[in-house]
């Protein structure tokens, strides 16, 4: 947390209590000061290791503690990962994210991780990873290999956290974010709405994120996807307006961060997603899966973009900017592959 917090809990609570339309108006004004309101960042991820996670996160079907029917998959071979990255670049992607269902990587995994980061970077792509907790040495090694972004979510408020996870502490999550930042890697961190938390807990989560010494460059806001076999399978549905309100407050509190619609978009109608964009969301994941749950197909996303007058964000890479952007737009228009799917709730 910053020495002199930018926000207090009472200030954040006041935002959550504002009339919704007034809140949306404020969020949209702030959004337009820092971003093109017609541009949405589109990200794609690959799971390099799925399932058999030793953690007990109550929302997660990848935990080995719950019987969800998910089949564990071994760590992908380096060439498999690089081949997927090549295909992603040919399809127009400029950032390639890799996720592994681990509590933390082991030292024996580091040469493998460094090799795939270096290989993907050599293609002119930005790199992102979500691997669980990192120590200082691991963060620095990934940074030296060329890793651009690292995802590690806080999930919820410190007060509610123990109801959801017991196998790692909240402070351990904060420590990982600090190590990532100190290594020079950009931070991606957010949370989940629908865990059974209160509005005060949602305020507490955003308070933690916004008061970090440097707020995350990317803030994914997930809506709980209830998976049979997990302890939260019977949780109440999230009210759409409550979710939209959370997006708006995140935008106001972290005006220069990308606020990303992550897990749960498959269960949102177009109207809800449109209001999320109005509230300041400006990033999505696309592909057939997000983590191990459904995500809207690329063609549905493009149709929604057309209806709302939105466009995939122009992103600079080492070479071929215009050509890659054209390929991305063409891929969104004519998706014909399931090779790319979102593997982690970022």
Curated annotation (Swiss-Prot):
GO terms for biological process: biotin biosynthetic process. It is an enzyme of class 2 (transferase). Pathway: Cofactor biosynthesis; biotin biosynthesis; biotin from 7,8-diaminononanoate: step 2/2. [4Fe-4S] cluster binds at residues 53, 57, 60. [2Fe-2S] cluster binds at residues 97, 128, 188, 260. Residues 38-256 form the Radical SAM core domain. It catalyses: (4R,5S)-dethiobiotin + (sulfur carrier)-SH + 2 reduced [2Fe-2S]-[ferredoxin] + 2 S-adenosyl-L-methionine = (sulfur carrier)-H + biotin + 2 5'-deoxyadenosine + 2 L-methionine + 2 oxidized [2Fe-2S]-[ferredoxin]. Its cofactor is [4Fe-4S] cluster; [2Fe-2S] cluster. PROSITE patterns: RADICAL_SAM. Binds 1 [4Fe-4S] cluster. The cluster is coordinated with 3 cysteines and an exchangeable S-adenosyl-L-methionine. Binds 1 [2Fe-2S] cluster. The cluster is coordinated with 3 cysteines and 1 arginine. InterPro entries: Aldolase_TIM, BATS_dom, Biotin_synth/BioAB, Biotin_synthase, Elp3/MiaA/NifB-like_rSAM, rSAM. SMART domains: BATS, Elp3. GO terms for molecular function: 2 iron, 2 sulfur cluster binding; 4 iron, 4 sulfur cluster binding; biotin synthase activity; iron ion binding. Keywords: 2Fe-2S, 4Fe-4S, Biotin biosynthesis, Iron, Iron-sulfur, Metal-binding, S-adenosyl-L-methionine, Transferase. Pfam families: BATS, Radical_SAM. Its EC number is 2.8.1.6. CDD domains: Radical_SAM. It comes from the Bacteria. Catalyzes the conversion of dethiobiotin (DTB) to biotin by the insertion of a sulfur atom into dethiobiotin via a radical-based mechanism. Belongs to the radical SAM superfamily. Biotin synthase family. Homodimer. This is Biotin synthase. The lineage of its organism: Bacteria, Pseudomonadati, Pseudomonadota, Gammaproteobacteria, Enterobacterales.
